[in-house]
Amino acid sequence: MNTSISSQPPRIRIFDTTLRDGEQSPGCSMPAQQKLVMARALDALGVDIIETGFPASSQSDYEAMTLIARELRRPTLAVLSRCLQADIETSARALESATKPRLHVFLSTSPLHREHKLRMSKEQVLESVHKHVSLSRTLIDDVEFSAEDATRTEEDFLIEVTRVAIAAGATTINLPDTVGFSTPEEIRNMFTRIIANVEGANKVIFSAHCHDDLGLAVANSLAAIEGGARQIECTINGIGERAGNCALEELTMVLKVRNAFYNIDTSIHTSRIVSTSQLLQRLVGMPVQRNKAVVGANAFAHESGIHQHGMLRHRGTYEIMRPQEVGWVCSHMVLGRHSGRAAVEQRLRALGYLLEEEDLKLVFEEFKQLCEKQRLVTDVDLQVLMQDTTVQHGYRLASMTISDIGNRANALVELSDPQGQRVAETAQGNGPVDALFGALAAATGVKLELDSYQVHSVGIGADARGEANLSVRHNDTQYEGTGTSKDIIEASALAWLDVANRLLRNPENMQNKQNTALA
């Protein structure tokens, strides 16, 4: 591992881009209020830098940055900008309220991008880097420059680009594996050689941003650390463009479990990993696969008799980390019908929610109603309540009636619209779910094409609930929806409304969002 850079911090800086690159994952768009909720959780998780969006390309991202900056003081808050003067100036304005602002500018450097995307020569790229990094530094002290598609850029030219960016005032240099093309050995060697051959390399932090197109994002990020990188850009659950990004939960647990090998730490409070992962799944309606490392439902499950026997003798036989280390443990505080508002507020804070008085009052009323239906209230239940009461403003399900008539089913749904007015519609379909979705489409005016639909149980025993997950298309864009209820048909309706409300709340979702992928 490269340890010759004396200015590098003794730990890895975690740069979370869930709210920017992660949001570019199909169906994962978040409006400003949802981004604030997620940013609170990332702050509680201990993330060093939170990239909130691309304000020059989206008014919603501009508003999200403003909301987040007003509240969060500890982490550095970053926004992404192209190497364009207007973009940079807009981004700087969005950062005005931030206590620790960072302006993140990028420009493609590979021959493929120079020829077909930018139509710029090497000299023009170098000139643009110098001009726009210099401009950024006059507006914001903390400037990160990313050489997009760095891993497919000629090494001698990448050295020159990096030198120019540092000379112009960049404080962090990011060398992304934009299309997930590289191998760990290539990434390690690239960072080692760039750091060794660039004048001023000891004055900046080097960063890696690896995509998962070949399933190597985490491995490549670890290799970058071995090569001298001291910032890793990642997302919760690995969401992001195409196959996604380096998964924060996997990277941080590798560094923790294999600390004797890497000998470097992060600031992440790992016991909050699972709750943060589950919050994101709820907000964007995209569940992780059950066998997902660290945060999947089966991550600590043992079914084989041989494995179970070993676990009974000693957990270390088949577990390299304890479930409690990442948050797979129930709260010691049991919430139920006798719990007070202070207890509910404390648990919500632990899950990353900081509520105003009016919102807390509304959530607590919903909590008491839920306690009349079930004995105990879990973290999953609280996250569902937060969706229903403070995030998912829009159409609310008031009632529904499903009936089967021969080979056809009838559905009657009654909704409360965003203005509080009641809307009722009926529809027929090939089965109860088909009829239900038809009635919901008629009531909301939103047309969704169903790709996949799954229902499974969450929770334990009598308090278990059904969770519906569906994948749909709208205007050729894919979206994921999640709903939870004691009744699986109601859960299905809530999952459908989850998508519809996101589309209706954010008009940008009704169109194809501008592709601003930096990877």
UniProtKB/Swiss-Prot annotation:
Q: Where does Mn(2+) bind?
A: 21, 209, 211, 245
The record's note on quaternary structure and interaction partners says: Homodimer.
Protein known as: 2-isopropylmalate synthase
Record-stated family: Belongs to the alpha-IPM synthase/homocitrate synthase family. LeuA type 1 subfamily.
Entry keyword set: Amino-acid biosynthesis, Branched-chain amino acid biosynthesis, Cytoplasm, Leucine biosynthesis, Manganese, Metal-binding, Transferase
Q: Which reaction does it catalyse?
A: 3-methyl-2-oxobutanoate + acetyl-CoA + H2O = (2S)-2-isopropylmalate + CoA + H(+)
Which SMART domains does its entry note? Answer: LeuA_dimer
The cofactor required is: Mn(2+)
Any one GO molecular-function label of the UniProt entry: manganese ion binding
Coarse class of the protein's main subcellular location: cytoplasm
What's one GO BP annotation on this UniProt entry?
Answer: L-leucine biosynthetic process
**Which Pfam families did the record assign?**
HCS_D2 (PF22617), HMGL-like (PF00682), LeuA_dimer (PF08502)
- Annotated segments matching region Regulatory domain: 396-519
Role, per record: Catalyzes the condensation of the acetyl group of acetyl-CoA with 3-methyl-2-oxobutanoate (2-ketoisovalerate) to form 3-carboxy-3-hydroxy-4-methylpentanoate (2-isopropylmalate).
